[in-house]
Structures are given as structure tokens and as C-alpha cells.
Amino acid sequence: MSLAGQYLLHPGSHPSIVGSRPVMGGARLGRLLRGQQGDGVVNMLGNVLTLCAHAQRRTACMVLWAAEKQEPAQVTPESTSLLQLETARDHLRSMALDWPQRQSQSLQPAQLKWLSGCQFPLATPPRALMPDEVAAQRQQMREGLKSATPCTPLQCLAQWQATAQALQPGTRTLDVLDTNPVQQAANLRTIATALAADPDFALRPQWQGACAETGVWSRLRQRKAAPAITSAWSRLQARWIEMLELISAPTEPTVALLSSGALPLGDGQAIAWCEMARGLLLHWVQLDEQHRVQDYRVLAPTEWNFHPNGALAQALTQLKPDDAPAAWCLASAYDPCVQCSVNIQEIPHA
């Protein structure tokens, strides 16, 4: 069994999403990390969950701090600025490299020419950048995107527009985070209780008894101001727009565009959250008396969005069985962080 997992999409079928990421269930992460502390936990999670590894490491640091100290983790302007840069990097990497392939294209040298001339590296750096490095890379990304206008990913958006506007998945956003801190703490405790009680909750999560989705369009900062997201097109656009917002924000933001933090729960427990490129990431930990990991759970955006009964699954079921372009368009709107493929059924002709 591959712990990394994969998803197979079946347009026009039920179930329309088959697969999972086994490492997230069966208390496997807890067993993998049991007895470890501090940097050992952080580095292991970054190596196991490699996509958006910076967010995994950040969230692990916060949850371990909150569980050991039993006080909220410190979120500094410098760490927030770094999170915004790395999230923008995640967005660009997915759009520049994944989108063309999901449109049945091979990556052509001409499509990547603007990337080869861009000083901004797509690879996540092996260490956390210093503030001056963050500022320099933000500038590099802004300069590099100036030459992206005629190329991917804007070409991909233009090619998807008609298809994506016609795809109208149901919308029930995950609203665990809240502008009211008392309500947010209650919501986080509810999730923590579910994670602790059920080792497989992170594989098939539900919020208040139903499936929910998380993404750029469900950010805490936009909860009251953002227009309703009704189409795959809205979701795809939101990712491009947020990337531009993240690299254009002040170097030391006074208001965080991405929410993150940790809540101590008592008795060596804590839960931490981080708004990352694909949506809301949650970590829960139980430490023993020596501050070593006794149990650990990670609840990632992909498990919400690729739930077999969620909005994406229902939208896939409504497609024609041979509609691979629409299936890939939907998948890109929700952006899985594990391997994903589309299974097409041949329609017999009379």
C-alpha cells in the first residue's frame, strides 16, 4: 500500500472519486512520530508531506509549542510575510507546471521560456528565508510575472474560461475559523475532539454533519466581504488573484492575508491551523509528560475537497463519462496535493 495515496476521478459515475491518502488515516502519523520531539517531528512531517512542506513545518512548530507550553503560539509579522511568499510560490508552481498538463498539453519550451528567464525559484527553499531574502524574492516574482501575460498560467485560464464558467459545483465552505475568537476556539475544539476520537476522521472529514470545501475562496479575511463562489471559474480565478495579492502586500503586513495560529487544549494537547495554498491545514497533537509525541493527526485541504460525497464528487457525477477536459478543470479548481488521474469511459456508438 502506498502511503502517499492517489485519487482516480470517474466523470459520469458514482462514486466519482476513488482513492485516499492512507498516511492520513489509521493513526499512521501518530505511530510514525511517537516518541519524537521538536525538530524531529517538524522535519519528519516536511519529508513525508512534501507538497506545501513549509506549511506543514510551520503548523507542526505551532502545535508543538502550544501543546508543550499550553499557551498560544507566537505569530510574528516576519513569519506571516514568509508564509505569504511561500504560499504564492506554491500557487505559481501549481499553475505554471500542473495546469498545462491538465489541459492535455505537454510542457513546451516556449511555454516555459518566461520561467527560465525568471530569477524567482519555483522550488521551496531548504530553510526558512530571512526577511531580506523574502523581500528580494517577492520582487523577483513580481518582475517574473510581468513576462507571464502571454504565457501560462494566463493562457490556461483563458482556455478554461468557457468550460469553467459552466461548471457550477455546490458550495458549502468550511468555516472553522471565525472572526469571533470565542466561536473559533469552540470550532477548533470540535475538530480536535473528532480527530482524537476517530483515527480515520482525517480521511473522510465532515463539518457539522456534512461535507465542506476549503480553498482560497474560503479565507477568514474574506468571510463577510467576498462574493459567493458558484463556479469552477470563480475558484480558478481566485487562486491567480490571491497570488498577486500575496506578492503585492507590505513586506511586514499589519493585517495577515493568511490566518495561522495554535490553540492549547490542556493535558498536553493542542490544535494548530494554517491557511495554505490549497485551503485550511490543521494539526492536532497529544504529548506525553516528557513532551514527546504520543499521537498526531494532520487534516489537510485535499481530504475535504476530494471527499467522495463532497461538492467536487457531485459535480463530477453530473459530467458525461467521456468529458475529461471538464473533469480536469474541476480537479484544478480544487487542486489536489496528491497524484490524481481521470478515468474515461468510452461511450458506445449506435
List where the protein language model places each region.
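Acidic, carboxylate-rich catalytic segments that either coordinate divalent cations
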Residues: Y296-R297
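Active-site bordering "gate/hinge" segments
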Residues: M1-R278, T302-A350
